[in-house]
């Protein structure tokens, strides 16, 4: 009799077999599911505190996706030989799981919840993110914690005009899209994607396809819950204090309506904070006992009602715009004198200073991924200091939000970058958000594109991004173009679209409510396209095309190709030749296995000298060609002649003169410069030379 009460569910999901198990591992967690998807195995666990902390006014959910190197049969490369801080992929996957599950916890549930996912085994063809999403959904669903799930998720590729469910890593290389969608049976909640300039129709089709396929996983989770689910918590949302709400409305509503007539963000924020202070003072004056956190929540609800009702009634938005207008745009290129490329992109009260730096291949980021090491020649880093919103706060290493925003901007630009053959530089773009009032990640896309073009990167097209919002009440809805920060907090959907005039390159969507239909998404995408075209027009006015030359302060890269068999000649014994070349010419030289050599230098003369010397070292001896060289050694049967650096040929005694030569030293001496003709080379690369082939044959005199 086993001590385990193990329950297993298996299902076929496209090309993959998926097995979910519970009851054997991590039995003390609130919920634990071991999921195997064709050899990629993840363990998702969920634990929730039984009570919320007193005074808690937000939902403390944490999601940690952790990859173990043993999953790929590897030992960590760090000094301590154990896993350290999360990689960028782990951070992004943690966010990917957090985003669709967070809206499904009931309003007023403030108990701490922690979801931890360990990747225990990895099939390089099956990335861990989709298995982790499904396992997390299953673990939450069987735990009994208040959760309006389960959710399903799927990855969608677009290959040869067809949607492909959960493609392998190799298949993805041939896809023009990499899209992840997650949602409940009824509604899409989250989309994260990159694409190679695809139309709105194709992207929407992928979302619908992925959502339908995700329901296969949801059905399997329902079966697991039926057989292994724990009792649902006896939890009820705290009863609302209707008397206190009425008093707060009476004290604050008119003042908040007036505050939301103020167009300037800073002044409006100051006014709403004053309303909060006055409301609390008014309640005290009336002798009402209250919890300050609860009152602030009530005021937020009033603000949301004011803003939402005004927009649905067709009134102007917070800053006076209608639903389709983009805020005023200002663009300035080459802002910084000594950087390789820079742009200042301002849209209303959101501003990004974006700077591009060009480097050599040695500057590429080496990524030690679980599925294999690789190099990344394009980096985009996003920073948002607290002063951007007029606040104080911690400054230091990037937070999850900053990593996520940087990745989104990178996804948007990567489709239009030149190939390595067209532009061999490593590129690093840094977006410094200097002001923020909504959509700073999309400002980073616009500024990033302009900054790259300013640096002389031959982009295939301009890329612009726009953040959209949605407010929905029953059958009424309004799609908002270029949302403000307040509209983001008070709205029902936040989605960001980036692309060119030809199509979408990145799409991110987060939906907070059920009932967003395909038709609503269609309207939103069409309105986003209209805004994107407007911004692209402004960008093209500011900078029609990339600068023809890179900055004077950027390294110049010169590429040449040699026979791969000659690489060892260029490197030399113990690296002596390449070291001497770089030191004597003042250049950086990078050699690839296929014989591609990249020379980096700010001085074209130095680069030309390095090229000339490499050409000499790698030159092939040509049969029939005449060379001038010094004799390096005298032999009994001839002499060795240096034809070019590192290449000698044999001048046989019979090829010195037309007459018979008894002693080589009668004709030649070491160090003597002579002209010789190449007769042949054998299969081992040995070269046979002749002097007499260049001499006139003596006349034959008859006596």
UniProtKB/Swiss-Prot annotation:
Q: Which species does this protein come from?
A: Polaromonas naphthalenivorans (strain CJ2)
InterPro entries listed in its UniProt record: ExoRNase_PH_dom1, ExoRNase_PH_dom2, ExoRNase_PH_dom2_sf, KH_dom, KH_dom_type_1, KH_dom_type_1_sf, NA-bd_OB-fold, PNPase
Location comes to: Cytoplasm
Q: What is the recorded function of this protein according to its Swiss-Prot or TrEMBL entry?
A: Involved in mRNA degradation. Catalyzes the phosphorolysis of single-stranded polyribonucleotides processively in the 3'- to 5'-direction.
Q: Does the keyword Magnesium apply?
A: yes
Task: Domain (KH): give its ranges.
Answer: 555-614
Q: What is this protein called?
A: Polyribonucleotide nucleotidyltransferase
Catalytic function, reaction form: RNA(n+1) + phosphate = RNA(n) + a ribonucleoside 5'-diphosphate
Which class of enzymes does this protein belong to? Answer: transferase
Q: Which residues are listed for Mg(2+) binding in this entry? A: 488, 494
Q: Which GO terms describe its molecular function?
A: 3'-5'-RNA exonuclease activity; magnesium ion binding; polyribonucleotide nucleotidyltransferase activity; RNA binding
Q: Which cofactor does it need?
A: Mg(2+)
**Any one biological process term the GO annotation gives:** mRNA catabolic process
Under the heading PANTHER family, the entry gives: POLYRIBONUCLEOTIDE NUCLEOTIDYLTRANSFERASE (PTHR11252), POLYRIBONUCLEOTIDE NUCLEOTIDYLTRANSFERASE 1, MITOCHONDRIAL (PTHR11252:SF0)
The terms describing its cellular component in GO are: cytosol
Query: Into which family does the record put it?
Result: Belongs to the polyribonucleotide nucleotidyltransferase family.
Which keywords describe this protein according to UniProt?
Answer: Cytoplasm, Magnesium, Metal-binding, Nucleotidyltransferase, RNA-binding, Transferase
Q: Which residues form the S1 motif domain?
A: 624-692
